């Protein structure tokens, strides 16, 4: 019995060769910030129905490029390089009725797994050659624009000093330690500089520290 497998996932997923081999179709969310998980689920369900009822034969190809970068210049809105690539890919999908789905993968860079990378997943109706050609083309475009994804960086000291110089509430985002991107979330670099340069500023700093949690659980309310 041949059972079709259709997968929907985050566009920041680590898509492996095994996942491509063991599924009929992989559809990623199209928006970052993530606004369309339910809509992507609907697209996946429709494709599954078409496979079962309309004899659609999905052929999928993923040309992966070894590009790892933060999400700073990778929103799918505005004029980021990733948004431009995504819009171009979606226009390609609209212009070719034989394309069932296109997805652009930007893998979370801190997952720390073998064979990480991103690129275009193309699914066609029984036309692997076209899927391969388009996937390779867009993955090459992605690689060729890699320098555009480099963000402006600040040291923790620079970020804190710049933040405290502004008379407003400030959000400092340490993207390299983002738990949602696969990092541990235990960096105290920003906290250290806040203590050094703004010890009396009211601040909230998130730090993953199970040992500190254990100590707190064993102390009464009001302890320091």
Where are these regions (language model features)?
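Loop-rich catalytic cores of soluble enzymes, especially ATP-dependent carboxylate-amine ligases
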Residues: 33, 50-56, 67, 213-224
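Active-site histidine-anchored catalytic micro-motif
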Residues: 1-52, 174-188, 195, 199-210
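Core alpha/beta catalytic barrel or barrel-like domain that forms the active/cofactor pocket
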Residues: 12, 59-62, 105, 112-113
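Hard-cation-handling environments
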Residues: 72-224
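Short hydrophobic/aromatic-rich motifs at helix boundaries and adjacent loops
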Residues: 17-21, 58-60, 132, 164
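Conserved anion/nucleotide-ligand pocket segment
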Residues: 42-45, 49-90
